[in-house]
Structure formats: structure tokens, C-alpha cells
Amino acid sequence: MEAAASVFDERGYEAATIADILTRAGVTKGALYFHFSSKQDLARGVLDEQFAEGGVPPRQSKLQELVDTSMVMAHRMQRDPMLSAGARLSLGPDMREIFGGGSVPGWIKVTEEMLIQAKARGELLPHVNTAETAWTLSACWTGVQIYSQTLVNREDIEHRVSVLFEHVYPSIATPAVLARLEMGRTRGAEVVAEMRRLEAAEVVGDQVAS
């Protein structure tokens, strides 16, 4: 799957071939087709992986959790071909017809669910429409990553996503909540480090229990 993601990320869906993927993966055609029936099936697997990664640690503030999710994605986008390929597959020509919009509908849904929870907790200003805000925020995030990729090969994506939230959140978050939110450009790296510490502690706990 990682080999397929790398090829899709570098060449796009149409230009990528099964031969390219086989060469990159170092496996036989039979081994590949045992798991995936076609190039389209492989691409769907890459798209499904967008939501397979464990989520960020739960936060008292759902708006913080949404920032953390987005900043972790920005951090990993530069380092994980699976995420980068998923973005390219979702936004390429004719991808709506082939994949139904790729991961875009899923991310809009994830964003809206967090905003609904934030509203229930009193974190949002009264005028905020969660569905419209989720669509707009997701579209803005996508635009930021496309511009960052086009202009500087995503070298500034974490800074740009941070700036996005600094511009959007004052119009939707209550002042008390806004004052407590952490939205700096290093937030993604900090949360990833936190997740690794939690995973390591869980492994140690399992070993002790066994």
C-alpha cells in the first residue's frame, strides 16, 4: 500500500501504472492481485487509509481537538506519502466520477461532527451553522495545502494551516474558548510527539499486564 501511495503521489492516478507500483513494492503481480483486483482498488485502499490512522488525544475543547487533527495532518502531509497521495487522488481530474470525491466528503463529515460537539459544549458563537462552517473550513484547508504544495512543495504547510485557524476561529469561537486555544505552527509536531509518548506508555502497560 505504501508503494502504491508513493507512486500515486508522484505521478497521479492516470499516469501511475501497475508496473510502476510492482517495481516500487518489489512484489510479483500475483502477490499484488491477491490483495487488490485493480489500480482503482489500490487507489481506494489508499483513500481509506486517510481515516485508518488513530485520532488525536481527546480534548476538553472540541475546537482544540479540531485544530490538533488539522495540524497533525499538516505535519504528516510532508512526511507520509499515504496522506499526500490521498489528497492528490481526491482532487485530481475526474476523481469525483471515479472515487465519489475521494476523502473530501469524509473530512467534511469529521469536521462537522467536531463542530456539532463544540456547539453542544458552548464553544461556538450563536450564529454559527456547523454544516456550512465544516464545508468552508474543509475547503479552506484543502486550498491551503494545494497552494503550499504548488508554491513551496508544502514546506510552509504547518505555518499556513496555523494562520488559517487564526483567521477563522475568531469568527466562530466564543472569546473565552478562543483565548485558551493553541494554534501555533508547531502544534502538529507537539501533538504527534504526545501521541507517540501515549503509545509507548500503552505498550509498556500491556507488557506489565502480561
Predicted regions and their residues:
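Hydrophobic recognition helices of helix-based DNA-binding modules
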Residues: 46, 50, 54, 141-148, ...
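Hydrophobic alpha-helical connector segments
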Residues: 45, 53-83, 134
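Helix-turn-helix
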Residues: 3, 7-41, 45, 49
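C-terminal peripheral helix-coil segments that are non-catalytic and often amphipathic
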Residues: 64, 68, 72, 76, ...
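Short alpha-helical scaffolding segments that buttress acidic/His motifs in well-ordered protein cores
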Residues: 85-90, 137, 141, 168
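Hydrophobic alpha-helical bundle segments that form small-molecule/ligand-binding pockets
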Residues: 107-134, 140, 147-152, 172
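Solvent-exposed, amphipathic alpha-helical segments
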Residues: 3-10, 53, 136, 140-147
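Short secondary-structure transition hinges
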Residues: 73-127
